[in-house]
Amino acid sequence: MDKEVPKGSPREPALNIKKSDKSFKRKKPTENVLIFLINRQLGRHRSDIDLSRWVWMLS
């Protein structure tokens, strides 16, 4: 008796899952305005999306 491959599950090669490249990783937005501003002064710029979330706090 030979083993038969069931018709419902065809044999497919397993998909290779690559680790996401660090350059493609989305950075978590900073939750602390002070940390964001200090990092900006030190040259560690983040996108201004963080600032747009805090407009209500700064005005």
Curated annotation (Swiss-Prot):
This is Embryonic testis differentiation protein homolog B. Residues 1-25 are annotated as: Disordered. The gene is ETDB. Residues 1-10 have a biased composition (Basic and acidic residues).
